[in-house]
């Protein structure tokens, strides 16, 4: 067994590999970019070496630098994680030539399966069913358009070297083909260095089911059953579960055996995933093989009682697989939710910022937990960030993977809902509320699964903002007034003096004040804020809002956790303050309320309109309009790239482009004006 390995990755997967290596007594070496100098993966490894600037092309994608670090630190093997160089056959080959063990499949297997088009050809030869499409070398746009017309719309374009939902476009009609192809190729070259694409018939209600396979150097190959990854947005997985709901033993065996056959056909070694598109009628088609560990591997670990990273290390060291096919039974049900820094209500745009507060449910991390030979821990959280860390525009905005296990799917669903309610993040937008709606929605609960689930249930998954309840406003008001009291006391020479505090104490009278909090609901209704009238009493307050009056008192407090009594109702909640923003977590919901301090913004003028601004930091990759051009509402004007995903800024109304302020290739800051626009 190895005594030291280098982990050629960052974030959650680097921490995941380090955890298993540590448990096995193996020393670890981390590599990091300048942006990651204070990152968690740097802290958890035994050694860490800087390899370059923030841009992945100058750091995590520099195989020669990584190999040099491995040799200099005495590492015997390199674990690539997922993403970056994990499916780069040239890197795997270079490791072997340098005398390092690449913890993954042989370069030949990666080349065979790494190209989607080559893999499709290979599977066709092996009589594995394929979705109708074009997987050849010809990349002329006119030729590809003719192939798309032949296949029939809707057509799915995919980067041949791609993965993770990047470089994919669904095209509904022929008129949209050329623009979608150009965008797909730009994203493909940016993400994978290869703009080759393939085209396939897009199935309207398919399920995405993948099989975890594992092979060793002794001729053994097994499947560790399936994962259902049908719930996706932008072709990226949101929820994954194992086993797949409604999967019969016969179909499971058929898909598992097909996956093993695919792995054996390319002389596979190590962990791999064979992905299938499954139709509602039970038929399935080969989609691709990922020649690495998957993001969602924990759900397989939880139902099979295995540590897949340990398996990777043992197989790479030349040992046989720890279990046979007969020993790989399914126990219980596991679900994984990917918690991202993103705004689902704004097209899942990434959210850049600092994790000012992060409260999580009680959970194990990077392990099965539970008791040896017994059930695994009910909740697991795999995360590569900590409170205080920044989510930057350079890398994937994942905050954590939340994994739950239950004796059956019903119990797992209940545990997921509860765990999401206990996740509290302040500092940037997240998809937690969206995930909670998704998990609790009737479609997912009833296992009515397919890759269009999110779009089909958009009305319930993306509801319009609702008014904050009086209880949430009361909790914010109490937190505000308590913080004022503490500030006043800290500045007073005699904190007990009623004349020197902010308790609202007045001689012979009850002090009254107005508080104003605003949220997204206020903005959609044209309201400036929720107005709360507060009257200070001897043992609490009386509040009035929206024609409702109620007595209010603070019954208990521990840090940011408040217990209040509002009228006859007792309530509990956590309130985290971030400048003028009060984040109220109560009843499994998160209310972001901005306090409109009457003194803080006195004299400020409203900024002049007429400019379209960048929704996030990123790079301008295309300017589709020109100065002086008249445009229609919805016309694409500028395309930005952030985190290797493209985002189109469109005209908000009919109007005139008066000036363009950035050129292709320019980096722009969040909120930077991109162009001057005059509405008609």
Feature-to-residue mapping (PLM):
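Structured, non-catalytic alpha/beta "coupling" segments that mediate domain-domain communication
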Residues: 87-94, 336, 346, 449-450, ...
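Catalytic cores of soluble metabolic enzymes centered on carboxylation/carboxyl-transfer
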Residues: 259, 298-549, 670-676
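Long, charged amphipathic helices and adjacent flexible linkers at domain junctions
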Residues: 323-331, 455-458, 462, 589-614
């Amino acid at each position: 067994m190895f005594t030291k390995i280098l982990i050629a990755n960052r974030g959650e997967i680097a921490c995941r590999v380090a955890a298993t290596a540590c448990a096995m007594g193996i020393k670890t070496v981390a590599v990091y970019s300048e942006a990651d100098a204070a990152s968690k993966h740097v802290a958890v490894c035994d050694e860490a070496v800087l390899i370059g600037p923030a841009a992945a092309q100058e750091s995590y994608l520099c195989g020669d630098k990584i190999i040099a670090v491995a040799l200099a630190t005495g590492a015997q093997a390199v674990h690539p994680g997922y993403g970056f160089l994990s499916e780069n056959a040239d890197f795997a080959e270079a490791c072997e030539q340098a005398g390092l063990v690449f913890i993954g499949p042989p370069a030949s297997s990666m080349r065979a399966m790494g190209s989607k088009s080559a893999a499709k050809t290979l599977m066709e030869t092996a009589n594995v069913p394929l979705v109708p499409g074009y997987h050849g070398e010809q990349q002329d746009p006119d030729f590809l358009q003719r192939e798309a017309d032949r296949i029939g719309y809707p057509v799915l374009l995919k980067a041949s070297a791609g993965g993770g939902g990047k470089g994919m476009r669904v095209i509904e009609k022929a008129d949209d083909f050329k623009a979608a192809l150009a965008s797909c190729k730009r994203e493909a070259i940016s993400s994978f260095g290869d703009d080759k694409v393939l085209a396939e018939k897009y199935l309207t209600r398919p399920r995405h089911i993948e099989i975890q396979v594992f092979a060793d150097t002794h001729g053994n190959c097994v499947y560790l059953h399936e994962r259902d990854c049908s719930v996706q947005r932008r072709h990226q997985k949101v929820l994954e579960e194992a086993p797949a709901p409604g999967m019969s033993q016969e179909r499971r065996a058929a898909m598992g055996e097909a996956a093993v056959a695919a792995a054996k056909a390319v002389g596979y070694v190590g962990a791999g995933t064979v992905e299938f598109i499954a139709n509602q009628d039970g038929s399935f088609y080969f989609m691709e093989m990922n020649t690495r560990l998957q993001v969602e591997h924990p759900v397989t670990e939880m139902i099979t009682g295995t540590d897949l990273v340990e398996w990777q290390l043992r197989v790479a060291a030349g040992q046989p697989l720890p279990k046979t096919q007969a020993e790989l039974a399914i126990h219980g049900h596991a679900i994984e939710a990917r918690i991202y820094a993103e705004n689902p209500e704004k097209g899942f745009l990434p959210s850049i910022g600092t994790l000012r507060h992060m409260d999580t449910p009680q959970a194990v991390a990077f392990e099965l937990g539970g008791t040896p030979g017994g059930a695994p821990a009910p909740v697991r959280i795999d995360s590569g960030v900590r409170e205080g860390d920044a989510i930057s525009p350079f890398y994937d905005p994942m905050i954590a993977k939340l994994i739950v296990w239950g004796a059956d799917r019903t119990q797992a669903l209940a545990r997921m809902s509860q765990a999401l309610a206990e996740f509290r993040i302040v500092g940037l937008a997240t998809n937690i509320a969206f995930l909670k709606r998704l998990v609790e929605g009737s479609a997912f609960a009833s296992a009515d699964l397919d890759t269009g689930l999110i779009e089909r249930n958009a009305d319930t998954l993306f509801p319009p903002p609702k008014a904050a309840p009086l209880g949430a406003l009361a909790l914010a008001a109490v937190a505000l007034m308590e913080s004022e009291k503490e500030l006043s006391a800290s500045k007073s020479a005699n904190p007990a003096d009623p004349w020197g505090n902010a308790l609202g104490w007045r001689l012979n009278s009850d002090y009254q004040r107005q508080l104003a909090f605003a949220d997204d609901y206020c903005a959609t209704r044209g309201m400036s804020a929720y107005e709360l009238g507060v009257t200070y009493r001897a043992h609490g307050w009386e509040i009035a809002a929206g024609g409702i009056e109620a007595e209010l008192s603070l019954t208990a407090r521990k840090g940011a956790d408040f217990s209040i009594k509002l009228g006859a109702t007792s309530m509990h909640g956590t309130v985290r303050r971030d400048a003028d923003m009060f984040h109220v977590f109560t009843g499994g919901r998160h209310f972001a309320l901005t306090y409109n301090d009457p003194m803080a913004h006195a004299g400020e003028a409203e900024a002049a309109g007429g400019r379209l601004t960048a929704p996030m930091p990123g790079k301008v990759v295309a300017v589709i309009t020109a100065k002086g051009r008249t445009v229609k509402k919805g016309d694409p004007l500028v395309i930005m790239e952030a985190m290797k995903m493209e985002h189109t800024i469109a005209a908000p109304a009919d109007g005139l482009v008066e000036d363009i302020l950035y050129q292709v290739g320019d980096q722009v800051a969040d909120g930077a004006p991109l162009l001057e626009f005059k509405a008609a």
